[in-house]
A protein has these predicted regions:
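DNA replication initiation modules
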Residues: 54-87, 92, 113-160
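Residue-level detector of anion-binding/catalytic polar loops
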Residues: 96
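Short, conserved phosphate-binding/catalytic loop or strand-edge motifs used
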Residues: 99-108
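DNA replication initiation on ssDNA origins
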Residues: 1-70, 79-88, 142, 155-156
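Broad hydrophobic/π-residue packing in well-ordered secondary structure
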Residues: 14, 107-113
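Acidic surface patches and DE-rich sequence motifs
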Residues: 24, 102, 151
């Protein structure tokens, strides 16, 4: 669990929660309810997430210093997405990315760093990579390059 927490570190003062209403086995998008909680991310939240206990945990990748240790390209697809083709393309291009299946049947393409980097840099890199892979219109996390105030939380991404 500690390694998972380390690689998905982000904003500490808030997190996302998602309750899944329906899981479809045919690859269609899963409906759910998501919202931000302005509470610290606790060890219990991490543990429950890894045990599959709802709500699933969402982490805001941009931290209080506008830095990130990870970012994600969120490819929405509702059926028939070819994950193997995407992974083969990433491998061929020798990109340092990790791909997971999303709840919608699409993909989450993660980029991790060993040290915190400016949110603007990781966002620009992921937008560029998304375009190279043919997914230039996909959502990219972090969505912000900076938090505008102490009350700003940015957008969260549901963890795998």
């Amino acid at each position: 669990m500690n390694k998972f927490i380390e690689i998905f570190t982000g904003l500490e003062r808030a997190h996302g929660c998602t309750y899944v209403e329906k899981k479809n086995v045919d690859g269609t998008k899963v409906k759910g309810q998501s919202f931000v909680k302005r509470q610290h991310v606790t060890t219990e939240l991490w543990s429950n997430h890894l045990k599959g206990i709802e709500p699933s945990l969402g982490i805001i990748p941009i931290n209080e210093e506008n830095k990130c240790r990870w970012g994600c390209i969120d490819i929405d697809s509702y059926a028939g997405f070819n994950h193997k083709k995407l992974i083969n393309q990433i491998t061929k291009l020798k990109l340092p990315l990790v791909t997971t299946r999303s709840k919608s049947g699409g993909a989450h393409i993660f980029l991790f760093t060993t040290v915190p980097v400016d949110a603007e840099l990781i966002r620009k890199k992921l937008i560029s990579i998304g375009s190279i892979l043919g997914f230039g219109s996909s959502e990219v996390f972090p969505k912000q390059i900076e938090l505008k105030s102490k009350d700003d939380t940015g957008n969260f991404h549901n963890l795998p």
